[in-house]
Amino acid sequence: MNPSASPLWRIQTVATHAGKAFTCANVRQRAWARWVLGLLLVCLSPTAQAQNELYQDPTLPTNRKITTTARMLGISRAQVLDTYLSPEHYTGPDIRYISQTQREREGRRLSQLITHTGNVAYLKNRAGSGNEIAGMYSFDYALHYGFDWLDHRLQLQVGGRVETHVGFIYNTHNSNNPAQARVFLHLAPSAVASYKFRAGSIPLLLRYEVAVPLLGVMFSPNYGQSYYEIFSEGNYDHNVVHTTIGSAPSLRQMLTVDFPLLRSTVRLGYMGDIQQSRVNGLKTHVYTHGVVIGLVKRFTLIKLAP
């Protein structure tokens, strides 16, 4: 019997030719894929190189807006004295939220610093026989002019800021005149110093911020004057008072360090807020010292100059 005439042999022959054809087709497809991929790489390489040059070439004119935000929580110890409410000192925990936004442009020395602060404190006197609750919202706007040294690692920003404060102190023990309103506006020279360095392989940013009010205006009842007389009877008695560094010596400062943690930047440090005034025969001071911790984010917007 002729093996070439066998049906089984014919099936094997057809399968062999089909396998060879399939293999050849795969080889051709892979060859075409290599050619197409190579062509794409050749076409895209100049474009990618041009884009890299566009964003990395320092000679190209750019106008980048840089925004740095910090959201912090502060836990402090507060001491409050308001002789309109009580001659006693009250102390207790203070919790505050601080939101800071710094806006600047690359290549320019002017920058803006906007700060929102809200805090509340629960206080007791030394005998434990009386309580006070104090709260305050503050909005600060600062305009600074910057200097830098050591290849931009050391920076100093100096200028001034406007501070607005609205708050209260409530004495739970008083039946007559139980609360005191705190409303004032300050003009203060301010400064921010920062230094970039490394601890081993960890990049760190040490930052110090300070402001000292020089001039301002504040609301205050006069000695022995009730709020009923002011607002119900309309008896004005020098209740809007001009202040200076002599009558209202105050200081606000913050010393922090920024460091990377996982994929975030953490800010940790000390916060001190000293507010004092002696007007209309009344003395007030609020001393707050504590720890702040929060997150820092930095955003950069790139706009090509025409």
Regions found by a protein language model. Give the residues of each.
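Short glycine/proline- and aromatic-enriched beta-strand/turn motifs that initiate or cap beta-hairpins
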Residues: 50-109
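Short loop/turn motifs that connect adjacent beta-strands in outer-membrane beta-barrel proteins
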Residues: 59-67, 102-113, 146-156, 198-206, ...
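Residues on the lipid-exposed face of transmembrane beta-strands in outer-membrane beta-barrel proteins
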Residues: 75, 95-105, 139-147, 160, ...
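Extracellular loop and loop/strand-boundary signature of outer-membrane beta-barrel proteins
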Residues: 81-89, 123-132, 174-180, 239-243, ...
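Residues that define the transmembrane beta-barrel architecture of outer-membrane proteins
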Residues: 89-97, 131-139, 154, 179-189, ...
